[in-house]
């Protein structure tokens, strides 16, 4: 057995959510170790679409809308900070995002929902309803079936893989450590610290943060936390490089800086099956072609399936264990969008005990009603 390790904060889960929290903790001066799973673990970060997305978030929970806006407004600062520390460009672009519509009635419904959310927030919600003429001024290549779109100036996208690399390198630059291939078998609370047993060694920490995605369900039980998460499959198509035609990312189509186009936004309840299916890939491809006919004859170079981490109501869980104070769970399905607030105000809560107002209702207790 290797020597035990004693740290300030132990983060279990090395995806986007975990590395954002770990980086934030290291930035506060903690000695941080991140335990990451084995190579065949289900990883939402590897299948991420890369959107920094605000519109339509929090329609039934205004606090989440505020939290998401706060994150998007701080993404540029985080991207700059990561570049200065690591030299890794996460390829952030925030030109505003588009949700295309093929139906005027649905477009009207979407507008009314955003207006109502703005009233609840006490603001004019940051969006524009665009007709076809206005939309073509932004995106000339739309198809004839598109009747308009919702545009939100806060939306954008990043490279998920570059973001994960930048966060990891930033953590290491702040004397943090990432330990791969770890299977946590038991978490104990002894006195003022936690003992985390694994297949490699025992880790001692004053604070334990569970960010293991779908693995949080089992890990949470070890520290008195209820984490009712389930997998939801999403499938993605990646095309060959194309001429730049899509400056503004859409909810299910985006073009990267290299010119490739990603097509996605499928939602399937199929358990832990992360395979791709011809039927679903065909459906999302047809929708993308309907939006942008230029995609009709392009070559697809890659497809993959990934598993989102979903709670019963689709919103995050941010909670400290009442039974074992110092043990936290952080779980969500918008790890890219929320990275700045996970590295910032969420870490402030863990250090100072004052939870951000926007997320005070996001404990698992809401599922007991």
Regions from the PLM with identified roles:
Residues 7-34:
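N-terminal Rossmann-like FAD-binding beta1-loop-alpha1 element of flavoenzymes
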Residues 26-48:
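Glycine-rich FAD pyrophosphate-binding loop
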Residues 50-134, 138, 287-289:
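Dinucleotide-binding Rossmann-like beta1-alpha1 core, especially the glycine-rich loop
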Residues 292-369:
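C-terminal catalytic lobe of FAD-dependent flavoproteins
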Residues 150-206, 215:
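Helical element adjacent to the flavin cofactor pocket in flavoenzyme catalytic cores
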Residues 42, 198-245:
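Central helical "cap/lid" subdomain
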Residues 87-101, 126-174, 266-270, 325, ...:
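Helix-loop-beta segment of a Rossmann-like dinucleotide-binding subdomain
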Residues 240-327:
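Active-site lid/adjacent beta-loop-alpha segment flanking the redox-cofactor pocket in flavoenzymes
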């Amino acid at each position: 057995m290797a020597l035990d390790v004693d740290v300030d904060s132990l983060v279990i889960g090395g995806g986007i959510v975990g590395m954002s929290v770990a980086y934030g903790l290291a930035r506060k001066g903690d000695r941080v170790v991140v335990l990451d799973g084995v190579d065949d673990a289900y990883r939402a970060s590897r299948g991420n679409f890369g959107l920094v997305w605000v519109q339509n978030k929090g329609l039934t929970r205004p606090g989440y809308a505020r939290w998401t806006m706060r994150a998007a407004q701080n993404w540029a600062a985080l991207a700059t900070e990561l570049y200065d520390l690591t030299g890794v460009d996460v390829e952030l672009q925030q030109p505003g995002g588009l949700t295309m519509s093929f139906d005027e009635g649905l477009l009207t419904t979407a507008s009314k929902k955003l207006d109502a959310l703005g009233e609840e927030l006490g603001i004019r919600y940051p969006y524009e309803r665009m007709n076809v003429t206005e939309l073509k001024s932004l995106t000339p290549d739309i198809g004839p079936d598109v009747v308009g779109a919702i545009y939100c100036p806060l939306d954008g996208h990043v490279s998920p893989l570059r973001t994960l690399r930048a966060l990891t390198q930033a953590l290491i630059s702040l004397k943090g450590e990432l330990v791969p291939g770890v299977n946590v078998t038991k978490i104990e609370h002894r006195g003022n610290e936690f003992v985390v047993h694994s297949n490699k060694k025992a880790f001692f920490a004053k604070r334990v943060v569970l960010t293991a995605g779908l693995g949080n369900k089992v890990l949470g039980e070890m520290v008195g936390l209820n984490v009712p998460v389930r997998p939801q499959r999403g499938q993605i198509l990646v095309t060959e490089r194309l001429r730049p035609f899509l400056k503004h990312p859409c909810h299910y189509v985006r073009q990267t800086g290299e010119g490739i186009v990603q097509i996605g936004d499928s939602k399937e309840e199929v358990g832990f099956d992360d395979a791709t299916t011809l039927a679903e890939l065909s459906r999302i491809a047809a929708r993308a072609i309907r939006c942008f006919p230029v995609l009709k004859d392009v070559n697809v170079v890659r497809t993959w399936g990934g598993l989102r981490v979903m709670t019963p109501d689709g919103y995050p869980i941010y909670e400290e264990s009442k039974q074992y104070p110092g043990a936290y769970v952080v779980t969500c399905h918008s790890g890219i969008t929320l990275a700045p607030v996970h590295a910032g105000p969420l870490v402030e809560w863990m250090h100072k005990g004052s939870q951000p107002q926007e997320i005070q209702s996001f404990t698992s207790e809401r599922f007991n009603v």
